[in-house]
Amino acid sequence: MPDKPNLLALDFDGVLCDGLLEYFQTAWRTYLEVWSPPESTPPDDLPPRFYRTRPVIETGWEMPLLIRALILGWAESQILSDWHSISRQLLEQEHLSPEVLGSRLDQIRDQWIATDLPGWLALHRFYPGVCDRLRVILEQDMIQLRIITTKEERFVRSLLGQQGIILDPGIIFGKGHQTA
């Protein structure tokens, strides 16, 4: 009989933690700064449309661009079937780059965390039972745990730390991760 697996790699975003509320709020704040719309409050129908189309997003910089596409009237079905082309088209039309959008989004998130960490953390919800199960895995020390995320490691550490879960270095693989 083969040995039992001893490595467990888990996706943080959308598997361990539901961050949709924070994703939208950070994307909306970025949208406000990049496009300066006349209204600072999003249309009522925008958050649910964003949540439904969010699965097309591979990297954070795309989130404010997704809001832009929705505001400009792109149909959800088009976004879901051809996001790559739409995003490239919008970048070109708006004279933007992934680096500029990503940097702005990270700065906005950083500022929010620095000035209102409890408010930022409150927009993330761990799925039921996840934190208890992580504690069991860590206490048993029989499985090597790895957490993979599109977020920067420090954001994941903040969220887990709020739940009393402190992970050793090298367990979280996120945006900007560097190996020793």
Predicted regions, residues:
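Extreme N-terminal starter segment of soluble prokaryotic enzymes
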Residues: P2-A9
